[in-house]
Regions:
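DNA-contacting surface of Y-family translesion DNA polymerases
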Residues: 11, 192, 200-348, 360-366, ...
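Short histidine-centered catalytic/ligand-binding loop motif
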Residues: 120-122, 261-269, 313-322, 386, ...
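Short, charged/polar, Gly/Pro-enriched secondary-structure boundary elements
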Residues: 125-129, 358-364
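Gly/Gly-Pro- and Ser/Thr-rich, intrinsically disordered tail segments characteristic of DNA damage-repair
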Residues: 1-234, 247, 285, 376-380, ...
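Short Gly/Ser/Thr- and Asp/Glu-enriched loop/turn motifs at secondary-structure junctions
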Residues: 112-116, 155-158, 292-296, 346-350
Length: 474
């Protein structure tokens, strides 16, 4: 049943008005369009397989404790009668349709995920319209045109709008007028504040602070002293419902990447290497498709115990080559002794590769061989010049270690990464492959599985690092 909660019948006042709209159990409800007979039953949407995690759960399944991100095996134990549906719906189609409806309301729409967005409705007053009525109209259109339920919050800022939409679920609308902000916030738990995680909640609890009202009673100096200047000011502002962040209509990606969950926990270095290579090639292709270069990389590893670590790899030369990314990632795993020889000492459940510090390709690196061919520049001259530029800049090394493994400086010029940047020319090769794929098909040309740069042993890498430090000391 739809619910509407508001502090007064009309809008949120004549100040800033932000709506947060969140689709209810989005993946589940898209699947129900094809399986309406399952409506009202506990449903779990997840990829089929022994290592799957829950993507979405119906409210009937949530009543049994099932949550998104939970291992499917655990979800089955909590809700044994739940129907498990694989990911098969056209989620992007429905997501685009929802965003199109929101863009009809206002030009200021910030999509934050496939099923939620912020909308700045402040301009409605200029046209004599009620922002709350517009929010309800959007929900009505989504229900009528797409047969999907949604929840929304309307408030003076993004923080409050997000909290209101969460509180209105399922299928509701909650309006927070400016004069009732503290009435809304004070009785709630500090963990209900958007952005306050488990660590901050635990710290506040140690001081006897459990509600937002209790946190609001603390002075700014008290909060800064215990949580640091930035976090202290953030907590102080949130307790008063202060959030000045604008609705960002065009969000430029700051990072991109992917993860791979092994079918069974693995200690096989070849299996890990194959996963890294596949992730890296996909990542490189994605970078090139949007004209971006990675200024840094990060690796994510999850052991069989669910212990999770990330590791940064700093780069002196931006990359968009999947083969270069794979080589640098594998080198980092060996240096940190995540991979030793042909084995992995601690069984891995998941591996991930991410590109960070993204920059436009035209800002970051020399002209590629393919570009020079397209523009009529002598390919041999272009290749020689770009190889020289690569040699002068050197290669990116590894950054912060996963654990107690060997540390590797960000300015290293040796190692497999440097050889690839200086002599492998993988970026040019992969740009040419992209062009062939666009003209013919993705199956027309593939890299040979064995085409990788020769890798250094960890001992050689450490020895070179020691020599480099001696040279720097002299």
């Amino acid at each position: 049943m739809e619910q509407t909660r508001t502090g007064k019948a009309s809008g949120a006042g004549n100040g800033r008005v932000i709506m947060h709209l969140d689709m209810d159990a989005f993946f589940v409800n898209v699947e129900l369009l094809e399986n309406p007979a399952l409506r009202g039953e506990p449903i779990i949407v997840a990829p089929l397989g022994p290592r799957s995690v829950v993507c979405s759960a119906s409210y009937e399944a949530r009543a049994h404790g099932v949550r998104s991100g939970m291992p499917l095996s655990r979800a089955r134990n909590l809700s044994p009668n739940a129907t498990v549906l694989p990911l098969r719906g056209d989620y992007r189609h429905y997501s685009r349709a929802v965003m199109a409806i929101l863009n009809d309301l206002s030009p200021y729409v910030e999509q934050v995920s496939v099923d939620e967005a912020f909308v700045d409705l402040t301009g409605a007053y200029l046209h004599g319209q009620d922002p709350v009525a517009l929010a309800q109209r959007a929900r009505d259109r989504i229900a009528q045109e797409l047969s999907l339920p949604s929840s929304a919050g309307v408030a003076p800022n993004k923080l409050l709008a997000k909290m209101a939409s969460t509180g209105s679920k399922p299928n509701g609308l909650w309006v927070i007028p400016p004069e009732r902000v503290q009435e809304f916030l004070d009785p709630r738990k500090v963990s209900d504040l958007w952005g306050v995680g488990a660590k901050s909640t635990e710290q506040l609890s140690r001081y006897g602070i459990h509600t937002i009202a209790q946190m609001r009673s603390m002075s700014l100096d008290w909060l800064k002293e215990r949580f640091g200047a930035a976090q202290g000011e953030h907590l102080w502002a949130m307790a008063r419902g202060i959030d000045e962040r604008p609705v960002i209509t065009e969000r430029e990606e700051k990072s991109m990447g992917g993860e791979h969950t092994f079918e069974t926990d693995t200690t096989d270095a070849q299996e890990v290497s194959a996963a890294i290579r596949e992730l890296s090639l996909k990542l490189g292709k994605r970078l090139r498709s949007v004209g971006k270069l990675a200024g840094g990389l990060s690796l994510k590893i999850r052991y069989s115990t669910f212990e999770t670590h990330t590791r940064a790899i700093a780069l002196n030369v931006p990359v968009d080559s999947g083969m270069q990314i794979a080589s640098l990632a594998l080198e980092a795993l060996r240096v940190d002794e995540i991979v030793v020889g042909q084995t992995v000492p601690r069984a891995l459940r998941l591996i991930g590769v991410r590109a960070e510090k993204l920059a436009r390709a035209e800002d970051g690196v020399q002209q590629t061989l393919f570009d020079s061919i397209q523009s009529g520049v002598n390919p041999r001259s272009a290749q020689t010049a770009s190889a020289t530029a690569s040699t002068q800049r050197g290669s990116g090394g590894a950054g912060k270690s996963f654990g107690n493994g060997v540390r590797s400086g960000s300015g290293a010029r040796s190692g497999s990464g440097a050889r690839l940047v200086k002599s492998g020319r993988w970026s040019e090769v992969e740009h040419v492959m992209d062009a062939i794929h666009r003209r013919y098909s993705s199956e027309s040309l593939k890299p040979a599985s064995g085409v990788v740069a020769p890798e250094q042993k960890v001992e050689e890498r450490v020895e070179q690092k020691a020599e480099q430090k001696v040279e720097e000391g002299n």
